[in-house]
Design a protein with these regions (language model features):
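Di-metal (Zn2+ and/or Mg2+/Mn2+) metal-binding site signature of metallo-dependent hydrolases
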Residues: 125, 129
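A short glycine-rich, Lys/Arg-flanked "PGG" loop and its adjoining helix->strand segment in the class I
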Residues: 131-142
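Hydrophobic adenine-recognition pocket in adenosine-nucleotide-binding enzymes
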Residues: 122
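A conserved beta-strand element that flanks and buttresses the S-adenosyl-L-methionine
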Residues: 118
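Conserved N-terminal segment of class I S-adenosyl-L-methionine
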Residues: 1-112, 133, 149-150, 157, ...
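Conserved beta-strand signature within the Rossmann-like core of class I S-adenosyl-L-methionine
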Residues: 143-151
Length: 198
């Protein structure tokens, strides 16, 4: 009981959720197949070279990106060790293990400059999403693309208790986004957006 505290976010996603989060993500992907398919189409239109999938969950987008001929390597980053093991196993079984590496955090990816960043349904779970945008910007190559979405809303009935929605945090996020990135039009009617590093 009580509020989800920003200082607890890392431990929550790394330790507390266990395999339950993996199963919940898999079920959500199955029930949202049309939406997931559209985000995969958008990713296929936009990514190339070195791709970061940040907070990649069960790895659907990372594995799809790794299968693209335009992609050299996918750097899958997720705090949850169960998600990491699941994605490694899936990459191995799909013959993509050479094009995909699994990491706990962005700092363990070395000094790679990314040509594309994929961060879907993650930013609203971070206690400082503006800082994450700045870190992405710093690690992106000139002209790189970011595929992002977010939902800074706890819900009308509190159905998203692990989303941060403080108005000052959200305002700071949009100010950072607008200062560091330029939105790129795409024709798909989905919440995911494309941005070019400014």
């Amino acid at each position: 009981p009580g509020a989800f505290r920003p200082e607890d976010a890392t431990a929550f996603y790394e330790d507390t959720v266990g395999t339950g989060h993996l199963l919940e993500l898999a079920a959500w992907h199955l029930s949202s197949a049309d939406y997931i398919a559209d985000t995969l189409r958008l990713q296929g239109m936009a990514v190339q070279g070195q791709v970061l999938d940040f907070g990649g969950g069960i790895g659907t987008h990372a594995l799809s990106a790794a299968a693209l001929p335009e992609v050299d390597h996918v750097w899958f980053v997720d705090l949850n060790p169960h998600n990491q093991a699941f994605v490694q196993q899936r990459a191995q079984s799909l013959g993509l293990a050479d094009k995909l590496s699994v990491h706990r955090d962005l700092s363990s990816t070395g000094d790679v400059r990314f040509d594309a960043v994929v961060c879907l349904d993650v930013l609203e779970h971070l206690p400082d999403p503006s800082a994450q945008l700045l870190e992405f910007h710093q690690r992106m190559a000139p002209g790189a693309i970011a595929l992002l979405n977010w939902y800074f809303f706890k819900g009308h009935q509190g159905e998203y208790p692990f989303h941060f929605d403080d108005p000052a945090l959200v305002d700071g996020f949009f100010r950072t986004l607008q200062a560091q990135f330029l939105e790129v039009f795409h024709p798909l009617l989905i919440t995911a957006r494309l941005y070019r590093r400014s």
